[in-house]
């Protein structure tokens, strides 16, 4: 599979010029003739490199404000010409073979992401000549190397040095695959953007435009193959976005432990996204994609101790997420106390990693610190289709709550209500969360009946000897009947936070008043399926 091809002539035309001068210098130093266009040619000439403008090579000038510059037979014939088969016709038409094409495309995604981007701006940033050259070179990878990523520059020069100025077929094939992936992603962005504008062109409201395109094109890059999927008979892999804009499990670096499983990744995502909701030092422990213990504290050790107390049994073999650096004291507490599958935090101290290294199977991930949450899309696969929605980034503050009962909540009840409301957002529906003094004391998850979730939360608290009296309870959706309030009151809950919106709200509020419970309406639901 060697089939080496020497690189004697290269065409360089890039929008992102990072590293291009150094790459061109390396090519030129190895005797490669340089062809280039527009701004790339000017930059290389300014750096003293011998470069031929494509317009001089073709004898045809750039025109139409640069719209037409590489669409010429002398360019595409040089790229597509099959060595040993098309030599005679290339010589007849004075077409020189081009052995390498270095191209990246107009910044369409960056253009349309700018506030106030007009349709005209978007149109002018649709690259035509670039993708055409990329596809031509990729098609003829048997003879031509196509380079679309600056991260490949160094490896290409090294291989040329190792092969007397040549590249192997295996390398050219790999570069061709990257090229087709690159143009596919580029065309997908364009199709998605214009597809989302179809409603406006049909006279529909502005709100209807810019939401979801009529054809959804998705591009994800494989990060790793999994040993198996959710179950051992299922094959699986982990794919990530090319440009992840927020610290996440997709951006995380594994600094210790055996390979992550499918379920590890799913559970780690659930834990990390939950802990991001808190500004104070916080810990979230997750089992089977549900929080089983959450707390905030004076330190992450304090938060971990309190989160663990919610449900030590379920915490065994769980995933632990922090919103502060993992320190040695906390690492020691975890390793001494329980078996843990994954620990994820923005960072981990060297001392902490020395401690966790004693348990080689423990996976430790660092994801970097996060800032503002980034809007995006959530997907749910159904047989034959895909459900798409905005990420649930909704959250209410104290000033947005409505007190609907006779009794007002105390300051501590209010703090606990807001705390458990944040947790309930990440618990599978029907979700009920009991909290007291900024820690969960009982969680009822995934029940078909809301009242049973409330009962389970109370049972969990009782099993761990945690006092429910004076606690707050969050429900991810409204109570359809008063029975959930009666169950909470029986357990000792004194404050309830819920969306409201049931046709029996009056009945539910009356039940709260009967029990002396303060009730807050959020007017926002957090179903999670």
Curated annotation (Swiss-Prot):
Matching SMART domains: AICARFT_IMPCHas, MGS
Pathway(s) served: Purine metabolism; IMP biosynthesis via de novo pathway; 5-formamido-1-(5-phospho-D-ribosyl)imidazole-4-carboxamide from 5-amino-1-(5-phospho-D-ribosyl)imidazole-4-carboxamide (10-formyl THF route): step 1/1; Purine metabolism; IMP biosynthesis via de novo pathway; IMP from 5-formamido-1-(5-phospho-D-ribosyl)imidazole-4-carboxamide: step 1/1
Catalytic activity line of the entry: (6R)-10-formyltetrahydrofolate + 5-amino-1-(5-phospho-beta-D-ribosyl)imidazole-4-carboxamide = 5-formamido-1-(5-phospho-D-ribosyl)imidazole-4-carboxamide + (6S)-5,6,7,8-tetrahydrofolate; IMP + H2O = 5-formamido-1-(5-phospho-D-ribosyl)imidazole-4-carboxamide
InterPro entries named among the record's database cross-references: AICAR_Tfase_dup_dom_sf, Cytidine_deaminase-like, MGS-like_dom, MGS-like_dom_sf, PurH-like
Domain MGS-like positions: 1-148
Example of a GO biological process term: 'de novo' IMP biosynthetic process
Modified residues (N6-acetyllysine): 287
Listed Pfam families: AICARFT_IMPCHas (PF01808), MGS (PF02142)
GO CC annotations on file: cytosol
Similarity field: Belongs to the PurH family.
NCBIfam families: PRK00881.1, purH
Record's protein name: Bifunctional purine biosynthesis protein PurH
Gene for this chain: purH
């Amino acid at each position: 599979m060697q089939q080496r091809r020497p690189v004697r002539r290269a065409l360089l035309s890039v929008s992102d010029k990072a590293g291009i001068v150094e790459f061109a210098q390396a090519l030129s130093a190895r005797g490669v003739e340089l062809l280039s266009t527009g701004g790339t040619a000017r930059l290389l000439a300014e750096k003293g490199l011998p470069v031929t403008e494509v317009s001089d090579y073709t004898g045809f000038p750039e025109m139409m404000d640069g719209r037409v510059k590489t669409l010429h037979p002398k360019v595409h014939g040089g790229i597509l010409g099959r060595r040993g088969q098309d030599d005679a016709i290339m010589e007849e038409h004075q077409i020189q073979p081009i052995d390498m094409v270095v191209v990246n495309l107009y910044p369409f995604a960056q253009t349309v992401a700018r506030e106030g981007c007009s349709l005209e701006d978007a149109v002018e940033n649709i690259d035509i000549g670039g993708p055409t050259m990329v596809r031509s070179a990729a098609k003829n990878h048997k003879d031509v190397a196509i380079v679309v990523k600056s991260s490949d520059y160094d490896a290409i020069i090294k291989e040329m040095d190792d092969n007397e100025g040549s590249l192997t077929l295996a390398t050219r094939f790999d570069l061709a695959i990257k090229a087709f992936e690159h143009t596919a992603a580029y065309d997908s962005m364009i199709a998605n953007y214009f597809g989302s504008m179809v409603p406006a062109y049909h006279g529909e409201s502005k709100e209807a435009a810019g939401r979801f395109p009529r054809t959804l094109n998705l591009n994800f890059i494989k990060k790793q193959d999994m040993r198996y999927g959710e179950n051992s008979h299922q094959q699986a892999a982990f794919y990530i976005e090319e440009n992840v804009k927020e610290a996440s499990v997709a951006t995380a670096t594994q600094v210790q432990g055996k390979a992550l499983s499918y379920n590890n990744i799913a559970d780690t995502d659930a834990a990390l996204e939950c802990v991001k909701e808190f500004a104070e030092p916080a810990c979230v422990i997750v089992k089977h994609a549900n929080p089983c213990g959450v707390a905030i504290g004076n330190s992450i050790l304090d938060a971990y101790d309190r989160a663990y107390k919610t449900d030590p049994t379920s915490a065994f073999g769980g995933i632990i997420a922090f919103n502060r650096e993992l320190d040695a004291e906390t690492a020691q507490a975890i390793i001494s106390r329980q078996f843990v599958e994954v620990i994820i935090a923005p960072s981990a101290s060297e001392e902490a990693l020395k401690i966790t290294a004693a348990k080689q199977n423990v996976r430790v991930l660092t994801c970097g610190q996060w800032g503002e949450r980034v809007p995006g899309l959530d997907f749910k696969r159904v047989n034959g289709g895909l459900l798409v929605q905005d990420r649930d980034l909704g959250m209410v503050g104290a000033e947005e709550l409505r007190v609907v009962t006779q009794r007002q909540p105390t300051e501590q009840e209010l703090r606990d209500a807001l705390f458990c409301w944040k947790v309930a957002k990440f618990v599978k529906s029907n979700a009920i969360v009991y909290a007291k003094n900024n820690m969960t004391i009982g969680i009822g998850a995934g029940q078909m009946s809301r009242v049973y979730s409330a009962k389970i939360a109370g049972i969990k608290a009782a099993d761990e000897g945690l006092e429910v009296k004076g606690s707050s309870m969050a429900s991810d959706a409204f109570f359809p009947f008063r029975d959930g309030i009666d169950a909470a009151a029986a357990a000792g809950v004194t404050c309830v936070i819920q969306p409201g919106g049931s046709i029996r709200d009056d009945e539910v509020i009356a039940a709260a008043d009967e029990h002396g419970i303060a009730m807050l309406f959020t007017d926002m639901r957090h179903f999670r399926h």
